[in-house]
């Protein structure tokens, strides 16, 4: 099976969240009991991806390095690159060209939270795809705010529109994308849009025109949260808190995912829990390996 690498795009200036983000990256803000970046990182881990590039601003990159390190504590290989200015999501593949090499890749946006019991299974199909691209569609009641995808019964995209005034469907394209290696050359040949950015929608459109864009549907029972406003930060935190308090199980806990996937062992969990032992997070990790 081909190797697939992951990219987390955690740049941007977070102006919609000012003054909160004037001195700190949005993706370092807490969503209940974890930094926001843990959620997209966990999404890639659940897809079995262990080689991950984090792209951020010049000022925020050292902070992500301080928080996450080289990823070895979770059995990952984390690397970092700077995006000097926010010139569009598709720029991630140009910045990450060397990191991607000859492999396929997945891109997740640093402020997108995904939740759903079958999420790993849904992503597995995208990971195992030999060629082409997969995007994930989510039913929303305000599609005019998003990139909207229309698709046929076989799950093949037939139209893509960015924030359309008259949407052809209620399905928004989420911030999770799986591509084969040809995405790098596509990104390099893109022309900037009217707003001066290299648009991910244009990449998806090329795949669609080639008949190589698959749409995986996140149906009922899935949550997709985009945490770009003050209100959505609160809503996301409340959502995670409700699930965790009710079930006693954590959502998007990298230590737990690494352990359950066999990236790390019980001894390593013990070491990770030590500095956290005075709070519920550390206790959760220790309880997880009781009896081992």
Swiss-Prot record:
> Is Metal-binding included in the keywords of this UniProt record?
yes
Q: In which pathway does it act?
A: Carbohydrate biosynthesis; dTDP-L-rhamnose biosynthesis; Bacterial outer membrane biogenesis; LPS O-antigen biosynthesis
Q: Which residues bind Mg(2+)?
A: 111, 226
Please list the cofactors this protein needs. Answer: Mg(2+)
What detail does the entry give on cofactor binding?
Binds 1 Mg(2+) ion per subunit.
Catalytic reaction list: dTTP + alpha-D-glucose 1-phosphate + H(+) = dTDP-alpha-D-glucose + diphosphate
Keyword annotations from UniProtKB, A to Z: Lipopolysaccharide biosynthesis, Magnesium, Metal-binding, Nucleotidyltransferase, Transferase
Q: Name one GO molecular function term.
A: metal ion binding
Q: Name one GO biological process term.
A: dTDP-rhamnose biosynthetic process
Q: What is its EC number?
A: 2.7.7.24
> Could you confirm whether the keyword Disulfide bond appears in this record?
no
Q: Which residues form a coiled coil?
A: none
Question: Enzyme group, top EC level?
Answer: transferase
Xref: InterPro entries? G1P_thy_trans_s, NTP_transferase_dom, Nucleotide-diphossugar_trans
Relate the protein's function as given in its record. Catalyzes the formation of dTDP-glucose, from dTTP and glucose 1-phosphate, as well as its pyrophosphorolysis.
Quaternary structure, from the entry: Homotetramer.
Name the protein family.
Answer: Belongs to the glucose-1-phosphate thymidylyltransferase family.
Q: What name appears for this protein in its UniProt entry?
A: Glucose-1-phosphate thymidylyltransferase
The organism's lineage?
A: Bacteria, Pseudomonadati, Pseudomonadota, Gammaproteobacteria, Enterobacterales
């Amino acid at each position: 099976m081909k190797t697939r690498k992951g990219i987390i795009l955690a740049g941007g200036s977070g102006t919609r969240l000012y003054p909160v983000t004037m001195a700190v990256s949005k993706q370092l803000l807490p969503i209940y009991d974890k930094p926001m970046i843990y959620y997209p990182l966990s999404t890639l881990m659940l897809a079995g991806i262990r080689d991950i590039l984090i792209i951020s601003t010049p000022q925020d990159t050292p902070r992500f390095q301080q928080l996450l390190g080289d990823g070895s504590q979770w059995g990952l290989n984390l690397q970092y690159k700077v995006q000097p200015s926010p010139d569009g999501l598709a720029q991630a593949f140009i910045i990450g060209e060397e990191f991607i090499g000859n492999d396929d890749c997945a891109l997740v946006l640093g402020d997108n939270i995904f939740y759903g019991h079958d999420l790993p299974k849904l992503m597995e199909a995208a990971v195992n795809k030999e060629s082409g691209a997969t995007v994930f569609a989510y039913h929303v009641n305000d599609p005019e705010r998003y990139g909207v995808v229309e698709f046929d019964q076989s799950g093949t995209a037939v139209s893509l529109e960015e924030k359309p005034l008259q949407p052809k469907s209620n399905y928004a394209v989420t911030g999770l994308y799986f591509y084969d290696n040809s995405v790098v050359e596509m990104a390099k040949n893109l022309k900037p849009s009217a707003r001066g950015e290299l648009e991910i929608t244009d990449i998806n459109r090329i795949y669609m025109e080639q008949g190589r864009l698959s749409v995986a549907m996140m149906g009922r029972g899935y949550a997709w949260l985009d945490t770009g406003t003050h209100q959505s930060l609160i809503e996301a935190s409340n959502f995670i808190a409700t699930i965790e308090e009710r079930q006693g199980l954590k959502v998007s806990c990298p230590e737990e995912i690494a352990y359950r996937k066999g990236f790390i062992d019980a001894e390593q969990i013990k070491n990770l829990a030590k500095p956290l032992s005075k709070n519920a997070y550390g206790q959760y990790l220790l309880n997880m390996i009781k009896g081992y």
